[in-house]
């Protein structure tokens, strides 16, 4: 494939910003350390300005504040260099559009609705009464069971599975190995065994949701598990049944959200977080990696962290410095206790 080429003026014409220096052509985005003359790079943090001077990049995306001192360099000045870099990267890696057609080995049930603009890959399966929007890509070995509804331009990567009755909004992307709508973990104890509670809800994903590889979102017990517009969920995340996740929230890998948890919009949840069930997490909450969330977070905008039971980030940082000194502090405490005990004996 011939690489795309853009001049700096073409980039700023599409994305805004101001180019300075020569109007050179670039073919890809690269890190400062690896970039060559045909590449464009970026400086997100001004404390790394020295790396710009050492870089062979043909052009660099910088903020207006950081642009001083780079005379002679080809620059694009942008309000948010990191966001601008992401948009430039998209120019060089455009979204793949569906090539209309159904592979001969795919199985599409007669009652399914599959527009001619959809791409159905080898050994893929589309169940009865399922309706696909325009331009969907259901790739090799992916499965959409019966009675599902998919919006326009949904992408299911190889071996992704959507169980029956689920609804996916426009431009949803499900990566390989992810399972949407498997049974929730609902059981009732029957005295000597566990009785499985039928999971009669489904899963509803809003527009522009992205689900990472090998992530599971369980169907609701009676009503749907829901994920709001623009939310991004990383690989190997478990979302329990009946969860309600707001819009534009991000959840990193290895996190487990127990059943019936409500998470607000614009939250940031780090990797390896675990929650108890039936709690609420307010909008714009940030939870650091590895945190155990044991109770509801009712105040919006909190930043929480801790391997131990959850605390504010400030409290956790203040206490964390003592973790490696606990043994030493314990010995000192025992010594002081002994000295106090001895002093008490001597005074008698």
UniProtKB/Swiss-Prot annotation:
The keyword Transmembrane helix does not apply. The active site is at residue 241. PROSITE patterns: HEXAPEP_TRANSFERASES. It is an enzyme of class 2 (transferase). One of its GO terms (molecular function) is N-acyltransferase activity. Pfam families: Hexapep (PF00132), LpxD (PF04613). One of its GO terms (biological process) is lipid A biosynthetic process. It catalyses: a UDP-3-O-[(3R)-3-hydroxyacyl]-alpha-D-glucosamine + a (3R)-hydroxyacyl-[ACP] = a UDP-2-N,3-O-bis[(3R)-3-hydroxyacyl]-alpha-D-glucosamine + holo-[ACP] + H(+). Its EC number is 2.3.1.191. The keyword Acyltransferase applies. Pathway: Bacterial outer membrane biogenesis; LPS lipid A biosynthesis. It comes from the Bacteria. Keywords: Acyltransferase, Lipid A biosynthesis, Lipid biosynthesis, Lipid metabolism, Repeat, Transferase. Homotrimer. Catalyzes the N-acylation of UDP-3-O-acylglucosamine using 3-hydroxyacyl-ACP as the acyl donor. Is involved in the biosynthesis of lipid A, a phosphorylated glycolipid that anchors the lipopolysaccharide to the outer membrane of the cell. Belongs to the transferase hexapeptide repeat family. LpxD subfamily. This is UDP-3-O-acylglucosamine N-acyltransferase. It comes from Neisseria meningitidis serogroup C (strain 053442). The lineage of its organism: Bacteria, Pseudomonadati, Pseudomonadota, Betaproteobacteria, Neisseriales.
């Amino acid at each position: 494939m011939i690489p795309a080429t853009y001049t700096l003026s073409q980039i700023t014409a599409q994305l805004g910003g101001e180019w300075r220096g020569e109007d050179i052509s670039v073919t890809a985005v690269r890190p400062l350390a690896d970039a060559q003359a045909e590449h464009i790079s970026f400086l997100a943090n001004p404390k790394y300005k020295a790396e710009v001077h050492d870089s062979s990049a043909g052009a660099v995306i910088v903020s207006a504040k950081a642009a001083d001192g780079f005379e002679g360099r080809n620059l694009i000045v942008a309000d948010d260099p990191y966001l601008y870099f992401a948009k430039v990267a998209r120019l060089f890696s455009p979204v793949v559009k569906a090539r209309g057609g159904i592979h001969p080995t795919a199985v599409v049930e007669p009652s399914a609705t599959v527009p001619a603009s959809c791409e159905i890959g080898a050994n893929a399966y589309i169940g009865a009464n399922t309706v696909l929007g325009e331009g969907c890509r259901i790739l090799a070995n992916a499965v959409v069971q019966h009675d599902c509804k998919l919006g326009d331009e949904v992408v299911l990567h190889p071996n992704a599975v959507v169980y029956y009755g689920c609804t996916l909004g426009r431009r949803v992307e499900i990566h390989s190995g992810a399972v949407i709508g498997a049974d929730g973990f609902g059981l009732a104890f029957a005295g000597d065994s566990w009785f499985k509670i039928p999971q009669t809800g489904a899963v509803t994903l809003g527009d522009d949701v992205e689900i990472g590889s090998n992530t599971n979102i369980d169907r609701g017990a009676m009503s749907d598990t829901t994920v709001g517009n623009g939310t991004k969920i990383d690989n190997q995340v478990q979302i329990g049944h009946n969860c309600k996740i707001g819009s534009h929230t991000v959840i990193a890998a290895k996190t487990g959200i127990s059943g019936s948890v409500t998470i607000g919009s614009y939250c940031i949840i780090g990797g390896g977080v675990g929650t108890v069930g039936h709690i609420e997490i307010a909008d714009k909450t940030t939870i650091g990696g590895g945190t155990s969330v044991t109770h509801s977070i009712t105040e919006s905008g909190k930043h929480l962290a801790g391997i131990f039971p959850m605390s504010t980030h400030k409290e956790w940082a203040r206490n964390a410095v003592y973790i490696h000194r606990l043994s030493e502090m314990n010995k000192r405490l025992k010594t002081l206790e002994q000295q106090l005990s001895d002093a008490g004996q001597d005074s008698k």
